[in-house]
């Protein structure tokens, strides 16, 4: 029986690099889920390789526009709902440990992991935000507002200089 880690995708979406990260985590004896958070609004798509500058069938500009449109259709509440469903799913899997989970969020999903840790303190043992954006906002559901509810471990890795995550946002 393996402890559960939910690996939340970054803005470019599900792709081989995320599957590789999930495989590395799973190789350390974890049960890993890597959901497509865009399932509500977009068909799966793959950025070209090796430089990730466009989605097949789209210009670079249209690719970025699609990515940002998909991002804008997500919210802390929607992703929290998804995380709850994934936890429920894992509770019914024989090979998944039926206890609290770990969350890993990258860039756009960093705040989702942080938010879930505060909203689901009994279910989230640890949450990591790697290069997370929007960790502190003016919104009523800003992840930082729920910090006092967190019972698990939190890890934050932030860039020194990042236009998407200025100091006041982290």
Model feature map: region roles:
Residues 1-170:
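N-terminal cap/leader regions of alpha/beta-hydrolase-fold enzymes
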